[in-house]
Amino acid sequence: MCLLIDAGNSRIKWALADTARHFVTSGAFEHASDAPDWSTLPAPRGAWISNVAGDAAAARIDALIEARWPALPRTVVRASAAQCGVTNGYAEPARLGSDRWAGLIGAHAAFADEHLLIATFGTATTLEALRADGHFAGGLIAPGWALMMRSLGMHTAQLPTVSIDAATNLLDELAENDAHAPFAIDTPHALSAGCLQAQAGLIERAWRDLEKAWQAPVRLVLSGGAADAIVRALTVPHTRHDTLVLTGLALIAHSA
């Protein structure tokens, strides 16, 4: 049994896995929220941790583990040149984020023998190009949908700050008015839709460019908290997989 922890900038996701491909239970919590209830969980043989949220998150994770399973062995996952069938094309492999690395490993296992473009929607939107043979060819990083909207609100004098929940409601309203969709006739709707279309445009352009460059079909795989919103703007085929990082961590743990 392995405890898997994926600490992102917005949330900490966790799972208990009894094999490389099966979670016994899982959950998620906000950084500032109450601790997860691990009181009934069986003791794992160790914890495998991907943390891109900094020192404070690392300290909290350590405290949570220590409170439930004192002295439990912990492995902080870092990207390497090659692991679990994936080779790292970064110029400096260790500088690739551990979440992106684990996600690549999870995606390669989930969609074996397929070329992939993996789009993950969180605080940042990341794109990873993964060849069918497991070679990570490189990626792109852009502001996430929420960060785009928040940045416009913070750094312009007259634009509002729109949250994801508010933007989702605004887009529902816009979709009901076919006469204007996808163009808006007021600022909050225009900001919400514009940032959403920017996300979708990035994904679709990258997918088409990759298929052209590789002269082969590429599966577009979507993951992350904002994927539900982005999907509504996409016009290309895609597949959802929302546990890529945890799946990758499970594979890493069971290969140790």
Swiss-Prot record:
Pfam families on file: Pan_kinase
InterPro entries named among the record's database cross-references: ATPase_NBD (IPR043129), Type_III_PanK (IPR004619)
Residue positions binding substrate: Y90, G97, S98, D99, R100, T187
Compartments (UniProt record): Cytoplasm
Cofactor (UniProt): NH4(+); K(+)
Catalytic reaction(s) noted: (R)-pantothenate + ATP = (R)-4'-phosphopantothenate + ADP + H(+)
Active site: residue positions: D99 (proton acceptor)
GO BP terms in the entry: coenzyme A biosynthetic process
Binding site for ATP: D6, A7, G8, N9, S10, R11, I12, K13, T123
GO molecular function: ATP binding; pantothenate kinase activity
Statement: the UniProt record of this protein carries the keyword Kinase: yes
Protein EC: 2.7.1.33
Main location: cytoplasm
One GO CC annotation: cytoplasm
Annotated keywords: ATP-binding, Coenzyme A biosynthesis, Cytoplasm, Kinase, Nucleotide-binding, Potassium, Transferase
Biochemical pathway: Cofactor biosynthesis; coenzyme A biosynthesis; CoA from (R)-pantothenate: step 1/5
Similarity-based family: Belongs to the type III pantothenate kinase family.
UniProt cross-references to PANTHER family, sorted A to Z: TYPE III PANTOTHENATE KINASE
NCBIfam families for this protein: baf, PRK13328.1-1, PRK13328.1-4
Assembly information from the UniProt record: Homodimer.
Record's function text: Catalyzes the phosphorylation of pantothenate (Pan), the first step in CoA biosynthesis.
Protein known as: Type III pantothenate kinase
Native source species: Burkholderia mallei (strain SAVP1)
